[in-house]
């Protein structure tokens, strides 16, 4: 029953049929993974893709947590003997955790409040009398409730107690809270002020020293910037419920909302002034504080979710970047005083040689000889150069060496070295290269990530890759869960070579665990290469369920069965046998003859187990066995002579690589150790709502330099090449980027019109 209700809710959100969601719930509950369901159970789910299934999974967790909480609350209220049919219906009807907690608020066990103490002192009848019959005079009526033994010393104490009883009652009314919350969510303004004396210390938050903005309009990067400022003791944040009220106005519109909700009319009766005070205090002392805390938390939660989504999309683009392929590669980890670390790997990524050279400290000739020798010795095809400190100098040095090579010149490529140091110090790197200096391991990672970014980057904790917006400010548990899902989806979308994959890569395959992945590697080391997928069943602790989940994503090149190199799941091999019988072809002939496959009618091969989606997927695999969804390998060519920010001039048109996409634009590496910012307004001639619709991390783009601020190391770029450049000493309505190479975090700014820095982050 519960699964059916959940299916209805999620189906409406995804605009699909409830039976699709119901099937997905059953599959997930049976231990199937999202990649497996998306790829091999399309008939059951009606073709839900991995993006839809990830949303479904998140909502399923939320709604099941909601249901568990609902049952706990119902039990608690029932045990108190206060569960009415009306309340039960309201609790069953809500699909919001916030609303559920509002309904529970009056019944939630709590420490004795002032209101409860007043009730125990016998003041509830006074509160009800004055509220419901305002013709009574408060002072004279309260006299009969004075009781020194109960702590009610005089009529003032009695009236104060009665007021508190009503305040607590109204502040726990779910309907009243919903009305005021709705108004504040639409109309309240967040106010940010600098704490006196913190101006110098908090200079980086200067755009928020006196900032106001409609709560509903605050974008995630500005919200997180303000919260960071508050956490660092620089800013004070508050909500202004009445931004349009005249200065000096003492009454909030929220008091009017409360009055209307309670259906109170003031007609000049004796208790009206007292009742008006009850409403004012209910708002100022109870409701406003409660809802400000809640709405601030909601703003932060929403901002964190958006930031996590940005990180996930950037990570996807980075992991799915086109591999350079199986080529002999030299990795250079640039450095000045400490030297350039050099690692040589073969076309499979196996480490062959390492050294350290010092081309930037007066030993260039010696370094040239060393690099030239390694290139000749190992027939180097690619040189991967990390993009950190001394990157351009190292690139220029490498190109000078290449000029002396007559033929088969290697290609130099600058790659992101984000996370390389994390890999170098990791347990996995230590186990892989126990006798190799930590600094040299980074060069190995740089070389390998050019050959195959996905295979190498899975060895690094996703958060360390550094393509996120405020990743250190968000909920780390949610961030880890989201990024793990991204890595899992990317790995399974590409597939894994069973005979060469590392344990970290294997661990990301559907159905795998770290233990099973290590068992596969150990089995491979002891028994040699896998010749078939079925051999996986011999791996210790890899049972039928794990095999079912992982087999289709494992690839075996040149194995016993050509299908093992494809994305066809072993369970569907009988379908291929039918196709072979129908075409009178061998599997080798069929897999190299796309024309024959295209002439087949998929409906001919449908049976009770395998429907049209599966057969169509099989056809695609037969046409292009083990096809790689990643794009063609391309690299940016940095301009000669443009190596430092001081080399930039307004109007220059340069080529660069997108390193990070945020909600306010995209950062681009143009080879000067400082990323430039293309503001969202400069991404396209058309209106852009979401920068991710135009660019993604890793894209090669042409940009024009709009503005350069050398002292503050800020660069403003545009992808609208006809856009006018700005003189360096003038103000503009956009920011200048201050994103140094290797730095993974930006400070958000606001959109105050007189601030060059602030407006880009609007």
Swiss-Prot record:
Naturally occurring in which organism (per UniProt): Haemophilus influenzae (strain ATCC 51907 / DSM 11121 / KW20 / Rd)
CDD domains associated with the record: S1_Tex
InterPro entries: HHH_9, NA-bd_OB-fold, Ribos_protein_bS1-like, RNaseH-like_sf, RuvA_2-like, S1_domain, S1_Tex, Tex-like_central_region
Name recorded for this polypeptide: Uncharacterized protein HI_0568
UniProt keyword list: RNA-binding
Regions annotated as coiled coil: none
Classification via SUPFAM superfamilies: Nucleic acid-binding proteins, Ribonuclease H-like, RuvA domain 2-like, Tex N-terminal region-like
Boundaries of every S1 motif domain copy: 651-720
Amino acid composition bias (Polar residues), ranges on this chain: 751-762
Pfam families on file: HHH_3 (PF12836), HHH_9 (PF17674), S1 (PF00575), Tex_central_region (PF22706), Tex_N (PF09371), Tex_YqgF (PF16921)
